[in-house]
Amino acid sequence: MVEVANMWSLLLLPLLALLQIPGAWCWNHQERVLLRDIQAITLYADRYTNARRSAPVPQLKCIGGSAGCHTMVPQVVQCHNRGWDGFDVQWECKVDMDNSYRFGKVEVSCEGFDYPEDPYVLRGSCGLEYTLELTEEGRKRSQDGYRSGGFGSGYFQSNSNSWDTKTNGSSAIVLIVIVIIAYGVYKLFLSGPSVQEHPRPDEYGYDFQSQTRASAPPPPGFKSDFTDPHLCKIFGASKSFSSGYGTSHSNQGPGFWTGLGTGGVLGYLFGNRRAQPYQAPYFNTWTGPSNSDSMHQNYRPPQSSGVRTASGFGGTKRR
């Protein structure tokens, strides 16, 4: 009995293998399509092709062109078989497109079923590679837009805005430091004293108020106290300090008076900055915020003349 069972198992195994062959052949037959028999294919921007020997690829793939790949992205393209040139299928691909754009080079790419040059291809493996070009109308719109700061200048403006964002932190720190320095200079040299001191006669009988020698007017923005002769007394200097300043300090480096000059310049600059009127930014919906007077004109971006069905012609590429 054991020998009979073994004999039947040996006979059944080949039969089971033969029964699976038609199923595999049917599956391959359904997925294996003669390229010349394909009459039309519909391709979508958000889908990938089928794949068997290689990796899937996008059904619609832009590979360049004068218009760039991001200005207009077709969502659905349909390609029709227009004949056989003796080597491969020739295609006409159509899509609804703005009048500013057109197809350049188009090429349908399909995966050979067993090898790249196989006349049979995998069903659903075809995709489209194309270039996107500007029409004459598109070139005119592009030139008009660049003159006015629109139609493509958003890319450069967004880059400059991102650069400004990166530098805002360091600029704010520098501005804060300058404001602190200017405020310190202002409080130290330019603001009035909190306690008004009355002049006193010199211990040796010399009264500064009794002197009749005229002194030069103080520089703009400074208190007269800093040029008054009592300053010598306050800082412990002798009467001859001011008369000998030109000779005794002409060869010395920057000191107290240099600091005063620097404070005056900073005070002038910040005062001039505060005196400038504020100009509110003008927001242009085409190019973004701007302070330029030219942008206050009633500018409207150039409008397209409409949409049409654009066609592109090309052959087949195998992979």
Curated annotation (Swiss-Prot):
Disordered as annotated region, ranges: 200-221, 292-319
Keyword Metal-binding on entry: no
GO cellular component, one term: endoplasmic reticulum membrane
InterPro entries the record matches: SARAF
Transmembrane intervals: 172-192
Organism this protein belongs to: Xenopus tropicalis (Western clawed frog)
Primary residence: endoplasmic reticulum
Recorded family membership: Belongs to the SARAF family.
Protein name, as recorded: Store-operated calcium entry-associated regulatory factor
